[in-house]
């Protein structure tokens, strides 16, 4: 089960959305300024079963991601285009236990990713209207598995991911102090892990399957943003999403095959807050939870910082 858990941890390291790295507030000071640096810290705790509830798993994942815009320009029509580079480090650990046998195992993954991203906004001034975002990432992963009473197994893997996201911000109410908006959005993320068949120290072989996955995310975000002349604005948001994964990771060994359970279709709720400390510093924080079938659950806390030079 730990080999399968390591696949899930590696695949999760690619997760990234536009508004993970772009705050709603910073555009008011940085429509075409630069450069900037953004940093994202996140911690995720996941509970998941494998092979029709025969194996129980718990996983923890820490990710540190940072990047900078290399190009940021606003056209005469008020449209904004930006392009940047990013890097990420992830450290994950997980434990699995067999339901009807006294067998536990542990796994861990260290990952390093490099990537590029690009975004387009219809209205640079307040980010109303349409937007589009895309990114590409490539990652390298060091994996370990420790079975009870067995020697440690170590192996290397790699993978890549490609994403396209589109959405529209619709302002529906404006007061003297705040602007309220809805933002429907759609994101497609394709990831491909490359795991060679691995031979354990005892001679058993581990074959990895369903390494490619297309995740569809359809969601709606509600936003309340301060619109006064203050240089210390803030915003609140709530977001609901439906996520669909085309494949569940699988592994095969000694004629037996096991796969992920419960994450084919997921519901997600996110709540967040963004704050402008001054014209250069911005911070955002959010909490989210995902829920699926077969007792699948995942909870994440995220903290993002952005500095404008």
Describe every region a protein language model picked out.
Residues 11-18, 42, 57-64, 92, ...:
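Short linear motifs at secondary-structure transitions and domain/linker junctions
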């Amino acid at each position: 089960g730990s080999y399968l858990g390591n696949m899930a941890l590696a695949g999760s390291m690619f997760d990234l959305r536009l508004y993970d790295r772009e705050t709603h507030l910073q555009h008011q000071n940085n429509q075409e300024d630069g450069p900037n640096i953004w940093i994202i810290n996140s911690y995720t705790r996941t509970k998941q079963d494998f092979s029709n509830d025969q194996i129980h798993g718990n996983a923890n994942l820490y990710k540190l991601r940072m990047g900078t815009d290399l190009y940021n320009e606003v056209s005469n029509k008020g449209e904004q285009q930006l392009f940047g580079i990013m890097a990420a480090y992830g450290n994950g650990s997980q434990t699995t236990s067999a339901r009807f046998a006294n067998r536990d195992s542990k796994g861990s993954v260290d990952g390093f990713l490099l990537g590029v991203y690009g975004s387009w906004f219809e209205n640079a001034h307040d980010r109303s209207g349409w937007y589009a975002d895309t990114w590409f990432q490539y990652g390298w992963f060091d994996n370990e598995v420790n079975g009870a009473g067995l020697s440690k197994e170590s192996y290397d893997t790699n993978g890549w991911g490609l994403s396209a996201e589109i959405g529209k911000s619709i302002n529906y109410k404006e007061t003297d102090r705040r602007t309220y908006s809805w933002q429907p959005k759609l994101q497609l993320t394709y990831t491909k892990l490359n795991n060679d068949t691995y031979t354990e120290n005892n001679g058993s072989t581990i074959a990895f399957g369903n390494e490619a996955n297309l995740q569809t995310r359809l969601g709606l975000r509600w936003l309340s943003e301060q619109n006064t002349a203050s240089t210390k604005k803030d915003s609140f948001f709530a977001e609901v999403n439906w996520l669909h994964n085309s494949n569940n990771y699988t592994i095969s060994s000694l004629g037996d095959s096991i796969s992920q359970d419960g994450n084919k279709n997921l519901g997600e709720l996110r709540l967040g807050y963004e704050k402008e400390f001054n014209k250069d510093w911005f911070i955002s924080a959010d909490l989210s939870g995902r829920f699926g079938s077969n007792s699948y659950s995942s909870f994440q806390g995220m903290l993002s910082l952005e500095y404008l030079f």
